[in-house]
Amino acid sequence: MPIRLRPHQETALKSMQLSHHGQIIVPTGGGKTFIMIQHAKELLKGQFKTVVVVAPRILLANQLSNDFLEHIDNVDVLHVHSGETHHTSTTKTDEIEEWHLGSVKNQIIFTTYHSLHKITSSPSIEVSVMYCDEAHNSCSKQFFDAVKDMTMICERKYFFTATPRISHKLSLIHI
């Protein structure tokens, strides 16, 4: 099913296409997930890519997975968290590595801020893009190091939120 973005979502998507990082601020209910999905669809048209989608809770990671897979197919999916899912799931670094190296398709990894460090501890994983949902959680002391480590190994990183924590040094894509 094709996604029809609203004007503010189109503006955010165009800004993302021009920059490899940014904070996308859209009000609650404004369609942040559809912006992520459309960006990922375009990115996954090319050569082999690994996408990481980070959420604050397992339930939200599972919901994002359902939303993404409603619009994106022909990808391998891994969940890196301790919750139940219908997809391959693990929190063991060696199993994450094995899954990553054994895949012959584009990959999408759904995880939580709590389990993100398991991905950054997997040395062979090269991440093409990371989408952090409810990104204000990424600033918490408990998750900051894992998020920082992930930003070092991924080509593109986007932080989606309706409630930003703003620093004067951040690059913002504000809708």
Question: What is each PLM-predicted segment?
Answer:
Residues 27-29, 136-137, 151-170:
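Conserved helicase ATPase motor motifs in RecA-like P-loop NTPase domains
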